[in-house]
Amino acid sequence: MKYPRIFADFHNADEQGRLRLNRVGTIEDLSRQNIKLEDGQLLALYDEELEVDGVVQYSQEESLWVAVIDWKQIRQVEDMLVQAIV
């Protein structure tokens, strides 16, 4: 299943390894796609080189939205482009 693709900064993780969804590129993608974040929502998170599926959660500690990801499931974007061509 394809999930909405939202920019995320893979260097902007909290202490639990969740990606913070508060960068300008993230906010722009959410706005452009009219997405309102909700607990349990599934997203495809990407940057210039990487992509991974994640589950949205609200961080009470930081008062912002985060995405729980499996760091072992991160895919290289280049690999995905090559597979699409083949």
What do these predicted ranges mean?
Residues I6-G25:
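Short, basic/aromatic beta-hairpin or loop at an interaction surface
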Residues K2, L64-V86:
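Glycine- and charge-enriched low-complexity intrinsically disordered segments
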